[in-house]
């Protein structure tokens, strides 16, 4: 691969020679990959997948991705996008959410951190149930806020995660 960030769905970066910038800055060779592939390499080398030759590492965060390992090697595909689960269509129909990639109904629009926050906003706006989340600015709620409320037994927060989990599978 070229070391170039061709396009980042969640960042305003296009055609950034990131590996070269880092090499120039630190005087060391640099290679780049996405977070899911890096996580898979880390698990294969140091973590729960140590010694495994075939596995999939799912990542949920700003996006939804996976690092796929076959015969002890990360699978990149012909264009480097193997494992990009986030842009798999998970919801169809006129109410499917738009995604940053330009499509609608992508898994990432529901199961990412921003997707969970959006679900929280939608559910809180459509229910009169008590929830710890009402004490927060509805437009500033994060997935961490939902997690914290769920940890405290908040039923609406649990409903938000149930919805997300159903879509995630």
Task: Name each region found by the language model.
Residues 1-2, 18-30, 42-53, 74, ...:
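ATP-binding/phosphotransfer module of carbohydrate and carboxylate kinases, centering on a glycine-rich
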């Amino acid at each position: 691969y070229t070391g170039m960030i061709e396009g980042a769905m969640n960042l305003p970066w296009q055609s950034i020679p990131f590996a070269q910038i880092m090499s120039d800055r630190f005087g060391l060779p640099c290679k780049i990959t996405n977070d899911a592939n890096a996580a898979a390499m880390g698990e294969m080398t140091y973590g729960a997948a140590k010694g495994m030759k075939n596995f999939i590492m799912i990542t949920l965060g700003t996006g939804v991705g996976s690092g796929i390992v076959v015969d002890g090697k990360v699978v990149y595909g012909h264009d480097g996008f193997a494992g990009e689960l986030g842009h798999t269509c998970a919801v169809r129909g006129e109410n499917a959410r738009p995604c940053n990639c330009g499509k609608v109904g992508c898994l990432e629009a529901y199961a990412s951190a921003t997707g969970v926050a959006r679900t929280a906003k939608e559910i809180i706006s459509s229910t009169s149930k008590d929830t710890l989340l009402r004490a927060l600015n509805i437009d500033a709620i994060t997935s961490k806020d939902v997690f914290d409320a769920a940890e405290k037994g908040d039923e609406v927060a649990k409903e938000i995660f149930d919805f997300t989990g159903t879509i995630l599978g």
